[in-house]
Every structure is written in structure tokens, then in C-alpha cells.
Amino acid sequence: SDVYKRQPSCRIQLLRLLITEAASPTMIQCLYSLWETERVQQLNERDYTTLAYELALRIPEQGKEILQTQRQRIHNPDRLRQFDFISRAMTADTLKLDSLFRSLLQAENRRIEPWAATTLSYLNHPTRQDYAVKYIRPALEKLTEVQRTGDIFFPRNWVGALLRNHDSEAAYK
């Protein structure tokens, strides 16, 4: 039946959602096991890279090792450059995070807009919501420049990446 044929696709979509939303230690460990063994053949390199990013943020004591392993799995030079750009946002070092954020405020560091938006999104990841609230005002103050120097859709992506994961009163203010 048609429903049966769509089931594997639905399962992968649910797994992709779980990758970005998992919060319990048990589920994070389960995802780590999936990532470590690469046993879900329906997941592609991008899926495993996203999983590595999420795991690096959710298991910071293993983050460096996770990212190093994932980097070795990437063979496409363009995807490797993308990984090197975005993975800088996975550090637990707040000085490096702040420096990375400041670099995104410079137009030349936003040239590849999808990478910049993804990096900004990880800087404002739900696990960092309290810390990252300080990025909101400076990033919004750059919005006119982002609009002037970027693609027509980039300002919306910039604001979405910045605010999507914030729901605190401090962020609202």
C-alpha cells in the first residue's frame, strides 16, 4: 500500500526532527550511538554532520572529538569548507563564541549567507539561550547593513537564525 511505501521516509523525517530536538540524556546517548556507528543508511552526510553539531553542543566534553571524527568523514572539499566555517560555533569557549559572533557582524564574513545563518543559529542554540541573549541587540542593529549587503531573503534568514531559539523574557526585552 501507499502508506507502507511512505513509512521509511516518515521515519527519516522523524529522526531528523529528533536530531535537532533531543534533550534527554538517554535520547542523546542513543543519537550518539547512531552517529558513532553510522548505522542508519538512509541518513546522508549532511544528516550526520548536523547530528555531529548537535552532539558537540549537547555533550560538550566530547565535542572536540565528535567534530574531529566528523571532519574526517567528509570528503567533498566544499562541504569540508562549510564544516570548518560552521563547526567553529560548537566550541564551549565563550571567548571564541563572542569572537565568532563579532566576525559575523562584518559583511565579508557573511559572503556565503547560508553558512553565516547556520553559524548564527548555532550561536543561538537552545542550549545557549541564556548566554546568547547578548547577541540579539547587536545582530538586530546590523540588520540594515545585512539587508543592504545581502541577498533579498538573507535578512529574514538572519533574524530567524538569531531569534528562533529564544523564548525568554530577557530575549523579549
Regions found by a protein language model. Name each.
Residues 1-173:
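Long, ordered, helix-rich scaffold segments
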